[in-house]
């Protein structure tokens, strides 16, 4: 669960953050992938803005940012944060739990095939904040095809692999030709 919950100076991630939904004094954000790299007035998030318990505001460049209302010492502090920063914070939390030496860590990140170049660059910006040794980015269906090839020893040289991704209202396709 890609949830982050804030309460004063405290921060919770994943399931622990999701459990804070609706709890007084906690600000919970999620679905950051739907916001990252977009302009504040992008129509693709208009419906989402109505259901999210957090506000989307524009920064000085018109980019969509998350506005947090955080209780602190009896007052409410308003903080505006770029989605890239929050994505990096979430990924950083995951790495702290699982990776001993980041400077040796190799990682593959998948990016939705429907992302624009601006959204892809925003995701790369978030990941680059993690200071990993070797990072690769692939569209989600391409990564699925590569995983299929890796896990299928029966694939012969010069095979054609087609992966259809029917997720989330999109229809994405990757076609790969495999050769040793």
Explain the meaning of each model-derived region.
Residues 87-98:
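Short, well-ordered amphipathic alpha-helical segments that serve as non-catalytic structural scaffolds
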Residues 61-65:
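Glycine-rich phosphate/pyrophosphate-binding loop
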Residues 1-47, 55-60, 71-80, 96-180:
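Oxyanion-binding/catalytic loops of NTP- or PPi-dependent enzymes
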Residues 83-84, 88, 141:
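Structural motif detector for alpha-helix initiation sites
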Residues 52:
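Internal, Lys/Arg-enriched amphipathic helical interaction segments that engage polyanionic partners
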């Amino acid at each position: 669960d890609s949830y982050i919950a804030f309460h004063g100076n405290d921060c919770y991630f994943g399931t622990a953050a999701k459990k804070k939904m609706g709890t007084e004094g906690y600000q919970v954000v999620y679905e950051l992938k739907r916001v990252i790299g977009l302009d504040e007035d992008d129509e693709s998030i208009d419906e989402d803005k109505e259901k999210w318990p957090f506000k989307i505001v524009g920064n000085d460049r018109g980019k969509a940012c998350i506005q947090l209302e955080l209780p602190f010492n009896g007052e409410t502090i308003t903080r505006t944060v770029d989605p890239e920063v929050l994505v990096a914070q979430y990924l950083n939390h995951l790495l702290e739990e699982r990776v001993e030496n980041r400077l040796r860590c190799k990682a593959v990140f998948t990016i939705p095939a429907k992302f624009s170049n601006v959204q892809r660059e925003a995701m790369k910006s978030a990941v680059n904040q993690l200071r990993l040794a070797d990072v690769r980015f692939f569209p989600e269906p391409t990564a699925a095809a590569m995983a299929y090839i890796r896990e299928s020893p029966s694939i012969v040289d010069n095979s054609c692999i087609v992966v259809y991704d029917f997720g989330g209202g999109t229809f994405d396709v990757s076609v790969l030709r495999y050769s040793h």
